[in-house]
């Protein structure tokens, strides 16, 4: 049987303690290297540039005065989310 050695190598009972520790060490080294390369990539791009929302986004108002029902003087509604929700539910 030519594949007997392969079957024996893949059997969990044939691994020695040293072999398991070696495999564990290699996995730790691999994940450490992968983590360090991901950290270096994140340092090249600042979080401000990557996560910045546009100032005129419809999800918040820069002049938020706590009046969510609207402005009685101008008839203007400050709750911009209601437009998006009405589009979703209609």
Curated annotation (Swiss-Prot):
- Compartments, as annotated in UniProt: Host membrane
What keywords tag this UniProt record? Host membrane, Membrane, Transmembrane, Transmembrane helix
Q: Which residues form the signal peptide?
A: none
- What topology in the membrane does the UniProt record assign? Single-pass membrane protein
The biased composition feature labelled Polar residues covers 80-90
Principal place of residence:
host cell
Region: Disordered; residue ranges are 55-90
The entry's cellular-component GO terms read: host cell membrane; membrane
Where do transmembrane segments lie in this chain? 15-34
Question: Which residue ranges have biased composition labelled Acidic residues?
Answer: 62-74
Top-rank taxon of the source lineage equals Viruses
Record bears the keyword Transmembrane helix: yes
Name recorded for this polypeptide: Protein RL8A
Organism expressing this protein natively: Human cytomegalovirus (strain Merlin) (HHV-5)
């Amino acid at each position: 049987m030519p594949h007997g050695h392969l079957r024996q190598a893949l059997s969990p009972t044939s691994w020695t303690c040293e072999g398991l520790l070696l495999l564990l060490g290699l996995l730790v080294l691999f994940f450490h290297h992968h983590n360090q390369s991901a950290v270096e990539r994140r340092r090249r791009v600042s979080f401000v540039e990557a996560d910045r929302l546009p100032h005129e986004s419809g999800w918040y108002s820069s002049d938020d005065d706590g009046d969510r029902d609207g402005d009685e003087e101008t008839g203007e509604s400050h709750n911009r989310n209601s437009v998006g929700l009405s589009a979703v539910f209609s």
